[in-house]
């Protein structure tokens, strides 16, 4: 294997900048104004400000880019710097660059429903205008309840008259099909679809963005990517911690609403879609919508809902189950784990179960896609062989590996499980992977919507899950308990087994980068 030669930061950023200028309408001479609505919030300090800093540090932002924070809290730029800088991962040598970054930052404290405040914001934005035109990017780092008022005031008062205007909307995009449609219709009455960027940071993950290349560039995978060869698929999202500090967000509709309905379903689309006619954003999203239209509403009989309980053998947070969290209402039936089986009813995937699993307070942090292939006909090894699997690990330790059978070294003719492995940290030791938000925000500057959710995608996703969510809300059935730090409820394993997934538990992938 050829060794990867490390590029300097200047070389890497120079190459990327050249690609940006060739691929997109990316004008260095224009003034760009990045407005963060909700600048004092957790998302802004942990993700948005650090991301803008990394792009600024690497020279990937246009020269005249200004960051404007807007919130109803009485903060200053100094306050913003104090709370966000710990997430910058900066070094003492970068202090001059940091000073330059915050010199491009300003802050405004006012109410979100005060029209006069938006007029004042617009005056401040006009004062920053230094080029032939000004482009404005509004990031709504707000609770969804504030979207209507804020977008209306932005549209009426603050949009650029000489350049483009783009708006980033954070998930969740509604609570069900009706509320999502109402929100989409409201925003569509103010902005065109090519101005709206519905962001889900999982679509910016390196391995997720690699899915289309794996599928449509490698001839070895094309002929086997169908129901004739694949027995079932699982899409897994696991977190080792509970709801600590985030109860109010999760409690709305549970983990189906938070994780399964959007990030997992979006990854399913990339795995199941047909080959688009090009890498144009709308061509890709057209084929994602076609896949979603082939998925029927989730059947309650194909769903397991569960809620974590305390683990008396552990310490710390694990000793407190979800019902014991003082922020949780007594008798809450919110699910913290869910497993559901979907079917894509088309020629390629007819009969193949797509298993979606997500949960909190589990035994590990992991997000992955697992394709399990059909058994080999004519078994001559007396059922000693396990199914082949293609595993796409999104986090942690990004990897793509194929689990297959080989002869165990030694005197005897016995097969054992092994893998063909592309571990990103091992293969690309000298390559810096951009953060997911870094990729996506740069995409917004460039005008690329490939990795953002379109309104018709959103509508189809809610069509699939809304009946189930309404059933859960109506019935208020008590979820099945599982122990904090476990694999989840046994009933989820039984559901997977019932639809054809084979879990042997005899093999665990070892990250070679840590050996």
UniProtKB/Swiss-Prot annotation:
GO terms for molecular function: glucose-6-phosphate dehydrogenase activity; NADP binding. The modification N-acetylalanine is found at residue 2. It comes from Bos indicus (Zebu). GO terms for cellular component: cytosol; membrane. Its main location: cytoplasm. It is found in: Cytoplasm, Cytosol; Membrane. It comes from the Eukaryota. Homotetramer; dimer of dimers. Interacts with SIRT2; the interaction is enhanced by H(2)O(2) treatment. Forms a ternary complex with ALDOB and TP53; this interaction is direct. ALDOB stabilizes the complex inhibiting G6PD activity and keeping oxidative pentose phosphate metabolism in check. It is a peripheral membrane protein. The modification Phosphoserine is found at residue 8. Its EC number is 1.1.1.49. Pathway: Carbohydrate degradation; pentose phosphate pathway; D-ribulose 5-phosphate from D-glucose 6-phosphate (oxidative stage): step 1/3. This is Glucose-6-phosphate 1-dehydrogenase. D-glucose 6-phosphate binds at residues 171, 201-205, 239, 258, 360, 365, 395. NADP(+) 1 binds at residues 38-45, 147, 171. Acetylated by ELP3 at Lys-403; acetylation inhibits its homodimerization and enzyme activity. Deacetylated by SIRT2 at Lys-403; deacetylation stimulates its enzyme activity. The gene is G6PD. InterPro entries: G6P_DH (IPR001282), G6P_DH_AS (IPR019796), G6P_DH_C (IPR022675), G6P_DH_NAD-bd (IPR022674), NAD(P)-bd_dom_sf (IPR036291). PANTHER family: GLUCOSE-6-PHOSPHATE 1-DEHYDROGENASE (PTHR23429:SF0), GLUCOSE-6-PHOSPHATE 1-DEHYDROGENASE G6PD (PTHR23429). NADP(+) 2 binds at residues 357, 366, 370, 393, 401-403, 421-423, 487, 503, 509. Cytosolic glucose-6-phosphate dehydrogenase that catalyzes the first and rate-limiting step of the oxidative branch within the pentose phosphate pathway/shunt, an alternative route to glycolysis for the dissimilation of carbohydrates and a major source of reducing power and metabolic intermediates for fatty acid and nucleic acid biosynthetic processes. It holds the Pfam family G6PD_N. GO terms for biological process: glucose 6-phosphate metabolic process; glucose metabolic process; NADP metabolic process; pentose-phosphate shunt, oxidative branch. Belongs to the glucose-6-phosphate dehydrogenase family.
């Amino acid at each position: 294997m050829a060794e990867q030669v490390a590029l300097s930061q200047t070389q890497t950023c120079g190459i990327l900048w050249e690609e940006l200028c060739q691929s997109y309408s990316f004008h260095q001479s224009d003034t760009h104004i990045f407005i963060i609505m909700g600048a004092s919030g957790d998302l802004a300090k942990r993700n948005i400000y650090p991301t803008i800093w990394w792009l600024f540090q690497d020279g990937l932002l246009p020269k005249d880019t200004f960051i404007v924070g807007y919130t109803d809290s009485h903060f200053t730029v100094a306050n913003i710097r104090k709370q966000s800088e710990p997430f910058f991962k900066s070094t003492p040598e970068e202090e001059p660059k940091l000073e330059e970054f915050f010199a491009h930052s300003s802050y405004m404290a006012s109410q979100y429903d005060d029209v006069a405040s938006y007029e004042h914001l617009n005056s401040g934005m006009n004062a920053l205008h230094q080029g032939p035109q000004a482009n404005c990017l509004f990031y709504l780092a707000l609770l969804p309840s504030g979207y209507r008022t804020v977008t209306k005031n932005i549209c009426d008062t603050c949009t650029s008259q000489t350049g483009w205007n783009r708006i980033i909307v954070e998930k969740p995009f509604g609570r069900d099909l009706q509320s999502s449609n109402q929100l989409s219709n409201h925003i569509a009455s103010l902005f065109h679809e090519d101005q709206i960027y519905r962001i889900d940071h999982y679509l910016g993950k390196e391995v997720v963005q690699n899915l289309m290349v794996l599928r449509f560039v490698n001839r070895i995978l094309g002929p086997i990517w169908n129901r004739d060869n694949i027995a079932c698929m699982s899409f897994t999202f696991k977190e080792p911690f509970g709801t600590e500090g985030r109860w109010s967000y999760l409690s709305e509709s549970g983990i189906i609403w938070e994780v399964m309905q959007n990030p997992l379903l979006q990854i399913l689309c990339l795995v199941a879609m047909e080959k688009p006619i090009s890498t144009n954003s709308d061509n890709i999203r057209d084929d994602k919508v076609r896949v979603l239209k082939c998925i029927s509403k989730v059947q309650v009989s194909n769903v397991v809902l569960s809620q974590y309980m305390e683990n008396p053998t552990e310490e710390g947070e694990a000793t407190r189950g979800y019902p014991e969290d003082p922020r949780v209402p007594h008798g809450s039936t919110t699910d913290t784990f869910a497993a559901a089986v979907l079917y894509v009813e088309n020629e390629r995937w007819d009969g193949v179960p797509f298993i979606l699993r997500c949960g909190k307070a589990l035994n590990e942090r992991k997000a992955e896609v697992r394709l399990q292939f059909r058994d080999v006909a004519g078994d001559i090894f007396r059922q000693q062989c396990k199914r082949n699997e293609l595993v796409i690990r999104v986090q942690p330790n990004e990897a793509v590996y194929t689990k297959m059978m080989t002869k165990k070294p030694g005197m005897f003719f016995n097969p054992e499980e092994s893998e063909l492995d592309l571990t990103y940290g091992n293969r690309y030791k000298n390559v810096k992977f951009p953060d997911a938000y870094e990729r996506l925000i740069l995409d917004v500057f460039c005008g690329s919507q490939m990795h953002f959710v379109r309104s018709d995608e959103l509508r189809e996703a809610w069509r699939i899950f809304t009946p189930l969510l309404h059933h859960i809300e109506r019935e208020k059935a008590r979820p099945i308990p599982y122990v904090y730090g476990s694999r989840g409820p046994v009933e989820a394993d039984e559901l997977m087994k019932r639809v054809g997934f084979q879990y042997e538990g005899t093999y665990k992938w070892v990250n070679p980068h840590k050996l």
